[in-house]
Amino acid sequence: MKLQVLPLSQEAFSAYGDVIETQQRDFFHINNGLVERYHDLALVEILEQDRTLISINRAQPANLPLTLHELERHPLGTQAFIPMKGEVFVVVVALGDDKPDLSTLRAFITNGEQGVNYHRNVWHHPLFAWQRVTDFLTIDRGGSDNCDVESIPEQELCFA
């Protein structure tokens, strides 16, 4: 099956998580007016008294055409990925309780100035870079037993 890749927007992505960006977001000044703070752009949620981790993930570019075979989810915490050098990347998401609901499967491409924060329990494809090796600032839950993986019927990304 072919999966159409759409431009990422908060409206289109809201069921799956938060879009982390400054475009069309409110801010206030701090540090004597030298800094614009775009405050509270995503909800970081961590359950079971674990701690929040800040990491850097260095992702390799996917081979094209990319065929998807599995999705994962994290029931005990949100997971955010923010490209550190303005790189475009693709995210694939789905809703579903015990297994991904393929009727909700969506693919989005960022504009190079966006990150994403997946809600808890949102199915998503494992992180990959798009055109070149990409470093992602990653905010997620420390601890074990927080990753469910499910196979899905083959899906090939299709760009308009």
From Swiss-Prot:
GO MF annotation, one: ureidoglycolate hydrolase activity
Pathway entry: Nitrogen metabolism; (S)-allantoin degradation
GO BP, one annotated term: allantoin catabolic process
UniProt cross-references to Gene3D superfamilies, sorted A to Z: Ureidoglycolate hydrolase
Entry keyword annotation includes Lyase: yes
Catalytic function, reaction form: (S)-ureidoglycolate = urea + glyoxylate
Cofactor(s) the protein requires to work: Ni(2+)
InterPro entries (UniProt xref): RmlC_Cupin_sf (IPR011051), UAH_cupin (IPR047233), Ureidogly_lyase (IPR007247), Ureidogly_lyase_bac (IPR023525), Ureidoglycolate_lyase_dom_sf (IPR024060)
Keyword Cell inner membrane attributed: no
Alphabetically ordered keywords of this record: Lyase, Purine metabolism
EC numbers, comma separated: 4.3.2.3
Protein family (similarity comment): Belongs to the ureidoglycolate lyase family.
Function: Catalyzes the catabolism of the allantoin degradation intermediate (S)-ureidoglycolate, generating urea and glyoxylate. Involved in the anaerobic utilization of allantoin as sole nitrogen source. Reinforces the induction of genes involved in the degradation of allantoin and glyoxylate by producing glyoxylate.
Subunit structure of this chain's protein: Homodimer.
Protein's name in the database: Ureidoglycolate lyase
Species, as recorded: Escherichia coli (strain SMS-3-5 / SECEC)
